[in-house]
Amino acid sequence: MVEQEEADPREALADEGLLSPQVETWRHIYIDNYRDWFELARELNRYAVSLFQDHQDAGDGGPANAAAPTAVRVYGRALNAYTASIMLAERAMTIEAVGAVRPIHEAGFWLSLLATNPEKALEELDIDHHKHAVDREQLRAAYPGNAELHSASVQREAAHAALLGKRRPISMKALAASLPGDPGYLQYRLASGFYGHLSQNSLDALKLRTGDKGVRPILGPFETEIPKALFFAIDAMARTTRYFAALVKVRDANDILSALRTTLTDLGKADAEAGPQGG
């Protein structure tokens, strides 16, 4: 394992924090130190990108909001979030890396519903669209003073409210509960609650214990947490990819994803047995 040269990493971060150019040097060290983890993350990414490219034109010529093109866009959203998570993990910004996993799980929930009940999925997405549009227009209250813009906003809100009617958006908990098997809701809650939102637990990660039993606030990086962050990201993307593959009827996806998940499990076990490490 490569050790960092700086005796005190804070010196390199004193001026620009985690935007310091030094972090790019450390990034290569982290990737080398956790080579197997990052190779697995990229192997899954290559497969996921190939699925997206192969089915990018699904539903071409039909309505843009039909099930097939909607599913492709949902999967694209998951791919982008996965990319962000891996890039953050490469820089040992592990809290943020797991926080980026949340939309991957949400994409997986929607893809599973699109695969099992496309009519319901499209209706729920329509409800979500109009409810958020109403909420967005109501933000005008924070910016009073322009009567013309205010009037136009009221009209837009009324149009969306009429289309929304008495319908209410489904919660992620209810959506996940309606899906077959284990959609990964527990992992989603962990990614959302512990990492995605400011909480006492997430604040506890930003402190370094000193020799006098005190603590010192720090920004990071958190190298030893990289495997955990990558586990969250790979697990979420593998689930979501399985749902997308089922929707577009890719026959060999289960075998490929099962092999990737076996490697993920083996890496997790090896990391647990090795215990804390890193520079």
Regions found by a protein language model. Give the residues of each.
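A cross-kingdom marker of C-terminal helix-rich interaction/assembly modules
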Residues: 1-279
